[in-house]
Amino acid sequence: GIYSYPLGQYANTDKSSGDPCAVDANDPNLAYKFGTMVNETVIAQTFNKDLANEYGKICGNYSLWSNLTIFWGCGTNLHRSPYNARNHEYYSEDAVLTSGQAVAFISGGKEYGVIIAPKHLAFNDTEINRTGVSVFMTEQQARENELRGTQASIEDAGALGVMTAFNRVGITAANAHTGLLKNILRGEWGFKGLESQDFIMNPNYAVLKE
């Protein structure tokens, strides 16, 4: 069978945290389980934008049920290698197919008032050393292929969130790259939404926060 995660596994039940989406620890809905669907690669293989749009609507609706204001997806990176552990989060190796599917998905999810945030900007392609690996490519490769999924998500679907990648663009961390985030993302594409680094995995973060 396919395992489905309960809401309680992810929900913040610490009401003192100041989190507007915190849930009461005794809330009976914590036992609610999410439905499990096929991944983005399978959706893309249908070449069906209507299906991708329905998929987005389901995820948007789930976000309301689970008290989420932001849905961190869809994945708009390309498959550059069959060995990338995140390929299930990305549609395909083709920039045009990826763009069409992402736009349809985001448009569907937005109908529920949820911020849909495509990821990982930009060039994520490996889980090994992903928090510091340097990615190099020509500007033509970046603009014609790697960036097009995210660009379409913003320009054509009006995505209001973006998650940046852990890797480096050249030798600069993606979340600190002025050319990528200021000049291209906000300057050329006109993005005015929420920009977030990938999920915090440092165990010292809680200590630093205190």
Language-model segment annotations:
Residues 1-210:
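Glycoside hydrolase catalytic-domain context in secreted enzymes
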